[in-house]
Amino acid sequence: EEKKRNSFLSFFIPRKGFIATPILIDINILVFIVMIASGVGIMSPSTLSLLKWGADFGPLTLTGDWWRTVTCNFIHIGAFHLLMNMYAFMYVGLLLEELIGGRRMFVSYLLTGLCSAAFSLYMHGETISTGASGSIFGLYGIFLAFLLFHRIAKEQRKALLTSILIFVGYNLVYGMKAGIDNAAHIGGLLSGFVLGIIYVVGYKFEKPDAQRTVSIIGELGIFCIFLFSFMILCKNVPPLYPEIRKEWESGIVEAYLNGELEEENENSNHSAVNATDNLSSRKVPAYTPVGNDDTWLSYYDAATKFSCQY
């Protein structure tokens, strides 16, 4: 029993040759624990909580909150979401980190996470997106490149390739369900596959310095592609996005959630409401939440046909 416990705990403790995976898993778990400690729901956090903690959401991400493309990869929608993602991460991490090393593992998680967030913003910027799955798909994409281009021992390659393809295929098909951000999965997978090819090419050089140089050049190239794409998205935001941001910054969102707006409108004392020609005063009537799961954004969707989901 003691051996089993120690074996399980070893997945979360960095050691030589296995550093990045446990650290990244620990960060994801720690963020979730801090969220819970601050009052966020353990099984189904509210939309407002996710946005406050850094979920990816086009009207906010593309109008100043660029950091959401990073933070969204460490935030999860409940304990089950975290558990499933960390299990998948642990599986690929055990296999992949031995091949590419800790530095590349760290960079891969962050880079493919950025690319998955950007592709999600491009495909449906109104979707509230969180979770490590975009980065995890990126890591599976890297491993897939290694399998296809023969960097894995032949006797292991077929079984691993079958396993990875089943995992990726199942999750992409399952991701067609409503409420799952398949665009992030695809963006992560494609960017990971390209990054994996770059790493494979780098390993064709015998000298470690040459391998490292190829890797870094490739990583910088992918980051530049992300940066260029993100700048284009920011430059071409729909007209509604800046208005939604005003709603967010004015405190109207929390007012709706807390059932305060109707009272504030009656008293006409809320400066943020009166200061701008905001969306709520023009399009959304007075509103009181009807349940714990009822949020300003879900009501906003019903009232104005603006799609908000995660």
Task: Name every feature range the model reports, one short phrase each.
Residues L82-Y91, T130-I142, D181-V200:
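Alpha-helical transmembrane segments that form the membrane-embedded catalytic/substrate-binding core
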Residues R151-Y170, Y174-N182:
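Membrane-embedded catalytic cores of phosphoryl/pyrophosphoryl-handling enzymes
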Residues E98-G102, F146-L161, V200-T213:
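Alpha-helical transmembrane bundle and helix-membrane interface signal
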Residues M105-S108, A132-I136, R157-T162:
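Cytoplasmic-side transmembrane-helix entry/capping segments in multi-pass membrane proteins
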Residues A20-A132, I180:
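N-terminal TM1-TM2 helical hairpin plus the immediately adjacent luminal interfacial "cap"
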Residues E1-P14, V173-W296, Y300-T304:
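C-terminal transmembrane module of polytopic alpha-helical membrane proteins
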Residues F11-I25, R103, R157-L161, R212-I216:
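Membrane-water interface of alpha-helical transmembrane segments
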Residues V34, C115, F119, M123, ...:
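Alpha-helical membrane-inserting segments
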